[in-house]
Amino acid sequence: MKIKAYAKINIALDIVGKREDGYHILKMIMQTIDLYDIIEIEKTESEIRLNCNKHYVPTDERNLAYKAAKIFKETYSISQGVDIKLTKNIPVSAGLAGGSTDAAGVLKLMNKMFNVNASDEELKSIGLRLGADVPYCIKGGTALCEGIGEKITQLKSFKDKIIVLVKPPFGVSTKEVYKCFDLSKVVFHPKIDSLIENMNNDDVYFVANNMKNLLENVTLRKHRVITNIKEEMKSIGSIGTMMSGSGPTVFALFDDMLKAQLCYDEMKKKYKDVFITRTI
């Protein structure tokens, strides 16, 4: 069995508080994009095996796809194992939910393969044990995600918007970024309600001008190259740029495919991980 596991970007990422257990309380607009890993699974006698086309990706319990298989087996008392083949296209430690979407893909595939017939809500509940973005990745699309990622409201689709992604040649630890975040210093929060209203009207220009990610400044302080990427993409014709998630990937919105292609060509001269894609 095979599935495409899609990446996401954040159109808005707000932090509205912190729980006693240390988790930040979030309010985010998430959007699936047409960049994906491919996951194939087959049944084995009992053990879980994971193979990946990228040598630097761990293939043991450090990998969320492996963890997802293990938790699914335990939750539904499945004695058989799975052989997972992961074809990775989404950059790692990039702010694009690459690990989370792989985990969600494994949960969905195993649900079908073993005829468990768990609902999306059940899969989301298992997913939350793996990471805050996993529940969203079960369904994907355009969604408002709140709490620690567990409250998901599907929104009207904001599909077919042209996106160029650039990931600088380093990864970022989400944990470290949240550790350095100081809510008391935030003056302006994302206008999430206005963004949703204008996304419903398909107003890409309002969205481009009002996208906001509270984690951006934290990552920018350590990595000035993110500012350089944003400025260069704007100078080539992007109508709006922002860092996705905890970074370091920057995405740019375009209203013209020729400008997007020019941006892709220019950025590809400097960076390895550059993609031209669209929202889906």
From Swiss-Prot:
This protein's UniProt keywords: ATP-binding, Isoprene biosynthesis, Kinase, Nucleotide-binding, Transferase
Superkingdom of origin: Bacteria
Stored Gene3D superfamilies: 3.30.230.10, GHMP kinase, C-terminal domain
Reaction it catalyzes: 4-CDP-2-C-methyl-D-erythritol + ATP = 4-CDP-2-C-methyl-D-erythritol 2-phosphate + ADP + H(+)
SUPFAM superfamilies reported for this sequence: GHMP Kinase, C-terminal domain (SSF55060), Ribosomal protein S5 domain 2-like (SSF54211)
MF-aspect GO terms: 4-(cytidine 5'-diphospho)-2-C-methyl-D-erythritol kinase activity; ATP binding
The enzyme's E.C. designation: 2.7.1.148
Active site residues per record: K8, D133
Pathway of action: Isoprenoid biosynthesis; isopentenyl diphosphate biosynthesis via DXP pathway; isopentenyl diphosphate from 1-deoxy-D-xylulose 5-phosphate: step 3/6
Annotated binding of ATP, by residue: P91, V92, S93, A94, G95, L96, A97, G98, G99, S100, T101
Family, per entry: Belongs to the GHMP kinase family. IspE subfamily.
Function: Catalyzes the phosphorylation of the position 2 hydroxy group of 4-diphosphocytidyl-2C-methyl-D-erythritol.
NCBIfam families: ispE
Protein known as: 4-diphosphocytidyl-2-C-methyl-D-erythritol kinase
Gene source species: Clostridium beijerinckii (strain ATCC 51743 / NCIMB 8052)
